[in-house]
C-alpha cells in the first residue's frame, strides 16, 4: 500500500500540502513564458512544487512538453551544453533517424554531429567532429527555442542542481552565452520555451543570480514560502488515521518545530513512526523514530564536522550558543577566533560548504540543515553533565 508519508521522491496531488500561493505564482510565470529559478536547501520541496504546478496545468488542459536534466555531475561547460541539447531533442524526437535529422537541420554548419556508433554504444545524441567554439555552443542553446517554435508547443526544461555548472572552469562562459541567446530569442519573439532552474546549494545559487547578477531580468526567482505547521499536522494526523492509528497533535507540532517544517525530514520521521507503531502512537515511538533518523544521518554529520578547521568548529559553537555577532572582542576572545578578518574568512568558508547562510539586514546566521543543527546542539556540542 502507498505510504501517506513519502520522502524518497517528489510528491503531487493528495500528498502535496501547502504553498498554494507559490503554485499560483509559478503557474503565472510559466504562462508568461518567464524563466524561473528556485533555490532552497535539500528536502524543502522544490521539485514537488514544480511538478505539482505542471500537473495542475495538464489537468486544466494546457498543452506543453517538459524535459528534465541534472547538472549534478557536470564539471565542464561543454558537457552541460551537450546534455542540455540531448534533453531538448528527446522532447520532440525518439528515433535515431529523427535525432540525425534534427542535428543536420538545426545544427548545420557547426561542429556537432549525430554519430550512430556513439549513440548505439553510449546513448549519445550529440557528438563533435572538432573543438567547439562559442558559435557551436550557442547553436545548441538556441535549440530549445527553435524546436518549440517548430513544433508550435510550449516547452519547459527543468535543470536540477543548476549551481554545479559554476563548478566548471568555463561556467561563466556558459552563463554569458545563455544570456546572449535569451536576449536574442526575446528580440526575435521566440517566447515559447522556459527554463526552470532548481538548486539545493543556497549560497552557490545566490552567488550566481544575486551577487554576480547573471540572468538579471531574464530569470525570476521563486522563493518558497514555509509550509504552515497546522497544515503539516493535519496532513500527518489524516495519514495515520487512514491506517487506523492515532497520534497526539502536540507531539507532531513538536516534531515540526524540531525539523523546522522541512518536509523531507518530517515525512521520513513519520514514515518511521508508522512502521514502529500500532494503534495509538505514544511519545516513546516518536523518540525511537527520531533516534533512527539521526542514526541514518549521523555519518554524514560527522563527516561534515571532520571537514571543518578548528576555527570553523569554534564559529559553529558560537552559533549554537546563540551568538549572532562574531566580530566583538568578547566573542573573538571566548571562542579563540583570532580577529574580525578571520571571522569574515570563516563565514565565507562555511557558506561555501553550504553549512550556513546569513539572512536579513543584520546578517543573522542560519544553519541550513535543521536536523544537523539539532544534532550539533544535542550530540556534538552537548554540555558535559
Where do the model's predicted regions map?
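A short, basic N-terminal segment
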Residues: 1-41, 56-59, 371, 382-385
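C-terminal leucine-rich, beta-strand-based interaction scaffolds used for sensing/assembly
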Residues: 2-5, 299-385
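P-loop NTPase nucleotide-binding core
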Residues: 32-35, 39-44, 48-156, 165-166, ...
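Alpha-helical DNA-recognition elements
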Residues: 56, 272, 349-352
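Sensor-1/coupling segment of RecA-like P-loop NTPase cores
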Residues: 149-151, 164-170, 174-211
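Walker B catalytic acidic pair
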Residues: 160-162
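Amphipathic alpha-helical "lid/sensor" segments that cap RecA-like P-loop NTPase cores
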Residues: 234-299
Amino acid at each position: 500500500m502507498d505510504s501517506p508519508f513519502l520522502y524518497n521522491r517528489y510528491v503531487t496531488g493528495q500528498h502535496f500540502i501547502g504553498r498554494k500561493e507559490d503554485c499560483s505564482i509559478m503557474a503565472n510565470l510559466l504562462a508568461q513564458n518567464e524563466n524561473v529559478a528556485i533555490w532552497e536547501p535539500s528536502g524543502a520541496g522544490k521539485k514537488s512544487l514544480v511538478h505539482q504546478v505542471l500537473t495542475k496545468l495538464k489537468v486544466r488542459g494546457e498543452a506543453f512538453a517538459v524535459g528534465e536534466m541534472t547538472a549534478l555531475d557536470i564539471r565542464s561547460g561543454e558537457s552541460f551544453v551537450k546534455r542540455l541539447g540531448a534533453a531538448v531533442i528527446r522532447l520532440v524526437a525518439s528515433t535515431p533517424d529523427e535525432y540525425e535529422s534534427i542535428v543536420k537541420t538545426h545544427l548545420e554548419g557547426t561542429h556537432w554531429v549525430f554519430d550512430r556508433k556513439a549513440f548505439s554504444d553510449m546513448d549519445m545524441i550529440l557528438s563533435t567532429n572538432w573543438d567547439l567554439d562559442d558559435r557551436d555552443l550557442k547553436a545548441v542553446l538556441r535549440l530549445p527555442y527553435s524546436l518549440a517554435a517548430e513544433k508550435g508547443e510550449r516547452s519547459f526544461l527543468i535543470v536540477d542542481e543548476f549551481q554545479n555548472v559554476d563548478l566548471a572552469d568555463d561556467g561563466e562562459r556558459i552563463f554569458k552565452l545563455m544570456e546572449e541567446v535569451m536576449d536574442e530569442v526575446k528580440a526575435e519573439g521566440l517566447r515559447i520555451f522556459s527554463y526552470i532552474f532548481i538548486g539545493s546549494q543556497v549560497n552557490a545559487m545566490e552567488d550566481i543570480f544575486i551577487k554576480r547578477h547573471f540572468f538579471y531580468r531574464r530569470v525570476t526567482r521563486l522563493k518558497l514560502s514555509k509550509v504552515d505547521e497546522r497544515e503539516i499536522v493535519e496532513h500527518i494526523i489524516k495519514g495515520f488515521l487512514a491506517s487506523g492509528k492515532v497520534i497526539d497533535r502536540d507531539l507532531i507540532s513538536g516534531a515540526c518545530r524540531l525539523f523546522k517544517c522541512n518536509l523531507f525530514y518530517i515525512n521520513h520521521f513519520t514514515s518511521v513512526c508508522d512502521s514502529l507503531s500500532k494503534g495509538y502512537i505514544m511519545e516513546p515511538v516518536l523518540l525511537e523514530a527520531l533516534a533512527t533518523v539521526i542514526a541514518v544521518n549521523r555519518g554524514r554529520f560527522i563527516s561534515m564536522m571532520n571537514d571543518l578547521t578548528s576555527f570553523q568548529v569554534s564559529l559553529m559553537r558560537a552559533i549554537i550558543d546563540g551568538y549572532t555577532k562574531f566580530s566583538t572582542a568578547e566573542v573573538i576572545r571566548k571562542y579563540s577566533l583570532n580577529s574580525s578578518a578571520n571571522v569574515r574568512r570563516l563565514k565565507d568558508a562555511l557558506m561555501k560548504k553550504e553549512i550556513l547562510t546569513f539572512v536579513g539586514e543584520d546578517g543573522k546566521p542560519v544553519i541550513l540543515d535543521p536536523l544537523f543543527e539539532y544534532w550539533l546542539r544535542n550530540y556534538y556540542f552537548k554540555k558535559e553533565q
